[in-house]
Amino acid sequence: ALGEGRFAADDFLREIQGLSAHFDVLRIDGVDYRHRGVPKAPPALTDAQVAARVAATPGATLDDFDAVCEHLARVHPSKYARLVEGVPLVGLTGVHQLTSQDVALRLVVLVDRLYDNDVPVAASGESLGAIFTPEMLKGGYRKKYFRSLSRLAALAEMANS
């Protein structure tokens, strides 16, 4: 389980229960704006559309999604910024839902670097909005995954404009 072995859970629980004895719980009704959802990713492009966008953008890259994921496994995440440095557009073909959390988390770091550098992403295959499994979106890294989905939607919109 997430966090297992990192701290003394029994001690933590005892301290939290001790603190909670000094507080009252108040229910506040209304819209919870933290759960507004993720911006919807634009529809996936065709391989030909991605290739055309890459061809029209000098210095752009065109790669197969699985090949990118395999490459990320061989590069330390601290070096991902170098991978996208100076790249005006990333074209990805064959995008599909990821089932491995390791691969998904590496992709999250890459998306962060793309977003930090304002590198648009043109993608074919499945929608970028479906890249993470429902289980991933409910798990311990859900905030990272939702941030990544939001950023992917923004980068895909940039590629479409």
For the regions a protein language model found, what residue spans apply to each?
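Short, flexible/disordered intra-domain loops and linkers
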Residues: L2-F7, M136-G139
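Short, solvent-exposed coil/turn linker segments
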Residues: A1, D29-D32, T61-D64, T93, ...
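Short glycine-/polar-rich loops that comprise or flank the Walker A/P-loop
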Residues: S20-D24, G86-P88, N117-V119
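Terminal-proximal interaction/regulatory segments of ATP-powered molecular machines
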Residues: L89-S161
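Conserved helicase/translocase motor-coupling segment
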Residues: A55-D116
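Conserved P-loop NTPase catalytic core
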Residues: G5-V54, R147-S161
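Conserved P-loop
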Residues: L45-G59, D66-C69, V119, E126, ...
